[in-house]
A protein has these predicted regions:
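Short, polar loop motifs at secondary-structure junctions
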Residues: 9-11, 63-67, 86-88, 106-111, ...
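Active-site proximal beta-strand in glycosyltransferases
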Residues: 72-87, 102-105, 124-127, 169
């Protein structure tokens, strides 16, 4: 099959593209920064032109882009997306109901939600990894024989895999730069106290999300005085969903990750790989 992949800065693409190719499929890649996930006339025209030049079986993306869905519907081409974020705000758009879409969601709750809305082609598919790549990475007789190349300021240096080994490692974002910290300065004392309590409660609950249900109509009315909801005309997301996800959700994740790392580091050596203040994701730091 001929597959056109729209690629953004998601780590999943390396394994996915390699897997497509290992199955004998032809993969072409398009990369272009979007003005909006929902509407971008320049990108839509560019994508339309590419799809006219070659007979593609489907377009693939990690996560969902309504603008791509719209073009695929016009061209009569299948659009396949596999989510890696939850909730995926870009899916709360009228284009999810187009026939061209084929959704694979890693979060079963979101899968059930959109299936219940009447989305036609949708399946639950957990996240995956290219096991062949990892098996090859660790196939050497000893870790010392394996070398990883790291580019730093244009100079390539070699590191043994042993340099990156550790009993406990965290790879990811600490979200120490989040919109809540800026908004908090403008919130009245009541809202600050309310949100602090909601986030603390969420941190003590495993397997459930209480943040959005705690955003009552009264609370959201107060929030609207300080937080502007920006969305396209065809989006059906609302203030509660967006604020719970992009503001309180990221702040809660930041608190949870930092507290867990500090608690672990108090008793054990912990390796942290992140793109936040202490350095780039390729850097290794002791917590």
């Amino acid at each position: 099959m001929n597959i056109l992949v729209y690629r953004w800065n998601s780590y999943n693409y390396i394994d996915i593209i390699a897997t497509f190719q290992s199955m004998g499929h032809q993969v072409d890649v398009i990369e272009q920064e979007l003005e909006s996930y929902d509407e971008d006339e320049s990108f839509a025209a560019h994508l339309h032109g590419i799809l006219q030049q070659k007979n593609y079986d489907f377009v693939f993306t990690v996560n969902y882009f309504a603008v791509i869905s719209g073009v695929c519907q016009q061209m009569g081409i299948k659009y396949v997306s596999w989510s890696c974020d939850s909730p995926l705000l870009s899916m709360y758009h009228k284009n999810v109901f187009l026939d061209c879409n084929y959704f694979f969601l890693f979060d079963k709750t979101n899968y059930l939600e959109f299936k219940g809305m009447g989305v036609k082609h949708i399946w639950h598919l957990p996240l995956a990894v290219d096991t062949d790549r990892l098996d090859e990475l660790f196939a050497q007789d000893t870790m010392d024989k394996m070398q990883l190349a790291e580019v730093d300021s244009g100079n390539a240096s070699k590191h043994s895999v042993r340099d990156f080994a550790g009993g406990i490692s965290f790879v990811g974002n600490l979200y120490e730069k989040n919109s809540y910290d800026e908004l908090e300065k403008r919130f009245p004392e009541y809202l600050r106290g309310y949100f602090d309590a909601v986030m603390e409660a969420q941190l003590n609950i495993s397997g459930g999300n209480i943040i959005e249900p705690m955003l009552t109509a009264d609370i959201l009315e107060r929030v609207s005085e300080y937080f502007e909801l920006k969305k396209s005309k065809d989006s059906f997301s609302d203030l509660g969903l967006v604020f719970a996800t992009t503001v309180l959700g990221f702040k809660t994740a930041s608190l949870q990750r930092q507290r867990a790392l500090l608690a672990l580091a108090a008793k054990f050596p912990v390796n942290l790989y992140t793109n936040t203040e202490i350095g780039r994701a390729s850097c290794r730091e002791r917590v």
